Amino acid sequence: MRKIVIAGNWKMFKTQAESQEFLKEFLPALEETPQEREVLLCVPFTDLAILSQSLHGSLVQLGAQNVHWAENGAYTGEISGPMLTEIGVRYVIVGHSERRQFFGETDETVNLRLQAAQKYGLTPILCVGETKQQRDSGETESLIVSQLDKDLINVDQTNLVIAYEPIWAIGTGDTCETTEANRVIGLIRSQLKNPDVPIQYGGSVKPNNIDEIMAQPEIDGVLVGGASLEAASFARIVNYQ
């Protein structure tokens, strides 16, 4: 049985004070949310400790946006698995396209981060996807298969979430057609040893398209960027019909 995972990725938004204001409106909106839906907030590092306290006992799990492969060391600006688990973090995004594009993340470093996340008790959300140029060149399938082959070396597929994020649809307002997203996610599933890995769609997910997205049989949830920053918007996504 595949799990439904709805994750908000706040990226580099929200101070601690702003995060608390968000929760005042967001948490009451989850009173009738089905318990079997896993709801996550993947927030900036500075928000993790206070949200760990604020979310205690709620339906919402806490997620980080990156993790280093070493337990500790001279890695300025990085954060380790034990540091995250100590404050109650359960999930961590690994290999987001913005990390790959702006910070030199490679499939090799993504793989190291995935293994480290699992080693220290975190469930990683692995992001894969193609650029518009790659899609227009017909490279979507080969690129994603290559990413999965390299990223998942020695990774436990019983403790894993995958997010398909077509890069050309992130923050652009262009949403991948739901049937096409379903097709690509089916391709991803066909490459896995464990067919029950939850696979999300990410890319301009909004309240007005969430019902159609979640009606697709291969899609097990969403990774939401901008629409997760407003409490009412993200609550509508979490409470999709």
Swiss-Prot record:
Pfam families in the cross-refs: TIM
Lineage: superkingdom: Bacteria
Keyword Acyltransferase included in the entry's annotation: no
Cellular component per GO, a single term: cytosol
Active site per the UniProt annotation: 96 (electrophile), 165 (proton acceptor)
Coiled coil region boundaries: none
Pathway: Carbohydrate biosynthesis; gluconeogenesis; Carbohydrate degradation; glycolysis; D-glyceraldehyde 3-phosphate from glycerone phosphate: step 1/1
Disulphide-bridged cysteine pairs: none
Keyword Cytoplasm: yes
Key words of the record: Cytoplasm, Gluconeogenesis, Glycolysis, Isomerase
Any GO MF annotation of the entry: triose-phosphate isomerase activity
Localization (cell): Cytoplasm
Alphabetized Gene3D superfamilies for the sequence: Aldolase class I (3.20.20.70)
Function of the protein: Involved in the gluconeogenesis. Catalyzes stereospecifically the conversion of dihydroxyacetone phosphate (DHAP) to D-glyceraldehyde-3-phosphate (G3P).
Family: Belongs to the triosephosphate isomerase family.
Protein name: Triosephosphate isomerase
Protein species of origin: Trichormus variabilis (strain ATCC 29413 / PCC 7937)
